[in-house]
Structures are given as structure tokens and as C-alpha cells.
Amino acid sequence: MEIYYHGTSKKFPAFDMAHALEGDGKIKMGAGFYLTTGYKRAAHYSCKSPGSTDFYVYTVEIPDLTPENHIEFKEPVNPIIIRHAEEKLGEPIPLEETTDGKFFRKYIAMKLAGKTGNKKLTPEDEMAAADFLISIGVIYNKVPFIWTKPVVHYDVIVMKPDVMRILKIEQVELAPPRKNAKPELVEGSQREIPLDSLK
């Protein structure tokens, strides 16, 4: 099992895909819940929802990432995943679309939506792609955010929320951002929210 953090302005007892777009509504790296290895990064994410005044960081446990259950930004897609996707689509996937997890995800989304060229994907298209990937055993999308080798700091987009277990919820305070900067966690402001109070 692996431990990550999730920032949000909402309190809830379990993750539900119906609420996956309640942050800023953007899907930059695919549909799902965005977890991160960095606590401070999660705290920053907690203020993404417009008009939010309360901020929370969730400590979350998920099953280990394996070569067969995740795709990764700027990394080739595992051959087993490619084979399962081709079997389900009923046709081969162009080699260039398998050289990067991002290309692969977008190709699947475009194919399912019947779109070509530079047509923009909708949140619904991305959700359909997530459902497709889940059906072939892919439940994570890994995206590094600090590129120093070896890469140890990254975000994980979880497409299948029922694998996520909330271990702890903490309400946090954020300092007003300096000019051209992001809001920052106020160290020591964390206040744990009892999980049984949300049931």
C-alpha cells in the first residue's frame, strides 16, 4: 500500500467519482481524483475551488502502483496495457500513441468520442476514457511534478475511487499568496477532523 495526500475544500467520508470535478473543474491530466506525494502541494490544491473558505488535506492509502495498473506521463505504455486496449478497441493503436502515457490516454479518449485532429476533449470524454482504462485494469495515471532524477515527487490521478481509503483529514490554513506566488500552508495550523463525524 502507498500513502498520498489530497487537497480539497470539501469534507466527505469517501471518494465518489460524481464529485471528481468539484475543484477548479479542469481536467489537465485525465479524469479522477488527484493525489500527490507532497503535503504542502495538497494544501495548495485545497484552494482550487472558486469561493472556497475552508481547506482540507486528506491522507489517503491506495494499493501499490504496478507496471500493469498505471500509465505515466512521458513514459512508454506497458505492452500488456497496449494489448488489452487493442483487444477492447478491436484495432491496433499507432506506435507513436504508446510512447507516452499522456498520448495514450488522449488517443483513447478521442477514439471513444469519435473525434479527430485538434478537437477539444470534454470532461465527459475524459470520464469515458477513464472508464475504458479501468475496464482493462488501469486505475492510475502518474505525473511527476519535480523532475530531478530519481523522480520521487509526483501526482497520481486515481480513476477508480473505491480503491482509496481515507486515513486522516486535517483542516489547514493558507497564508495569502505573495505577488505571483501560490498560497502556502501555515505550518502548525493543521487540525484533525474526526472521521466518524462525517458518517
Give residue spans per PLM region:
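Glycine-rich phosphate-binding loop of ATP-grasp-fold ATP-dependent ligases
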Residues: 31-33
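Active-site and NAD+-binding cores of ADP-ribose-processing enzymes
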Residues: 1-29, 46-199
